Regions:
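Core catalytic lobe of class I
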Residues: 44, 48, 53, 57-303, ...
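Basic helix-extension-helix modules of the SAP/HeH family
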Residues: 1-48
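The DNA-recognition helices of helix-turn-helix-type DNA-binding domains
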Residues: 18, 38, 286, 296, ...
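PRPP-dependent phosphoribosyltransferase catalytic core
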Residues: 312-319
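Conserved hydrophobic residues forming the short capping helix/wall of the S-adenosyl-L-methionine
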Residues: 15, 145, 317
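Small/flexible residues
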Residues: 7-10, 20, 30, 194, ...
Length: 319
């Protein structure tokens, strides 16, 4: 039995069943050692524990598949991906080397419905799916998501650029739909953010009375304390776009490349052990999401139609 995949509580239950002693105060790694030492000799390989580091038992799958996602997605096993990050063509006329970004809107939305349906089939019940897009496009795409799939709307604020528009509001963000089917995984402490100066200088450490009629009758008081690792993550992610000097080192030849910092934050927010599946990227593009998964130590499967971008992805992954 591979005890490394079990929680501490499950290991304690096994110790009880075996009528072992001295397990109640043991750490998970110590419990694994106890159980392995108590197991009868067998040809079945046992988990090896050294110090406090659990050895990986699942080999990494890291590959870029060339082809149309509508052809490749059906070949993937159901409930196999722990994270899906989809950065599809926005249908605004960008040049990806084909006409995929120049469709009539009804055709585009029907196409989106197909890859979303297949992606959700591949997504694990407790997995998380992200879809990038401009707000006005994503609002239409969201209508193609089954009603029983849970969702939230978050934003990526560029912070360092605006998309020029002389006759309307300057665009300074993109939207991200977050989807999950059942219980979501969310690691808030892995993606905490810097506190604002206003909070640190004006509120941290001070006592404040509760707002009457909101949480109490106004008789309760709260002391705001700054967490050592930063503030809770907000649904507006502030990360510079790869524009100008800020993106010079990371920038490659792709029209819609996403920053590694953004991709890594999304993955860290909901990642699970390697044994729980891979990161699926239906539109690999520049390879940022795949590279982020590799940097974090997860398996990934990227799908890309354009042969030149497949080469670009593989070059970034090698370097």
């Amino acid at each position: 039995m591979d005890y490394t995949k079990k929680s501490r509580e499950e290991l304690i239950s096994l110790c009880k069943e075996k009528k072992m002693k001295g397990y109640s105060t043991k750490k998970k790694e110590e419990l694994i050692k106890m159980l392995n030492n108590s197991a009868p000799s067998s040809t079945e390989p046992q988990a090896v524990v050294t110090g406090t580091t659990e050895q990986p038992t699942t080999p990494l799958r890291q590959e870029i598949l060339q082809g149309d996602c509508l052809s490749i997605l059906p070949t993937l096993q159901s409930n196999s991906a722990q994270i899906i990050i989809a950065d599809p063509p926005y249908n605004i006329g960008k040049d990806f080397g084909n006409d995929s970004d120049k469709q009539p809107m009804d055709e585009y939305l029907n196409w989106c419905e197909k890859w979303i349906k297949e992606s959700l089939r591949v997504l694990k019940p407790n997995g998380t799916m992200f879809i990038y897009g401009f707000s006005e496009i994503l609002a239409l795409i969201l209508g193609k998501v089954p009603w029983n799939v849970k969702r939230r709307w978050i934003l990526w604020h560029y912070t360092n650029k605006n998309v020029a528009s002389l006759n309307f509001w300057q665009r300074s963000h993109e939207s991200i739909i977050v989807l999950w089917k059942e219980d979501k995984v969310f690691h808030r402490d892995d993606i905490r953010e810097a506190y604002t100066e206003g909070f640190l200088n004006g509120a941290a450490g001070k006592e404040r009375a509760a707002t009457k009629g909101r949480f109490s009758d106004g008789d309760k008081k709260t002391t705001y304390t700054a967490h050592p690792n930063g503030a809770l993550p907000r649904d507006v992610i502030k990360i510079p776009a790869l524009a100008g000097g800020a993106g010079m080192k990371e920038r490659v030849d792709h029209p819609t490349q996403k920053p590694l910092a953004l991709c890594e934050k999304l993955i860290k927010s909901c990642k699970q052990p390697v044994s729980e599946g891979y990161v699926l990227v239906p539109f690999a593009g520049s390879g940022s999401e795949c590279l982020a998964a590799k940097n974090i130590g997860l398996s990934f499967v990227g799908i890309e139609l354009n042969e030149e971008y497949v080469k670009l992805c593989n070059e970034r992954l090698k370097n």
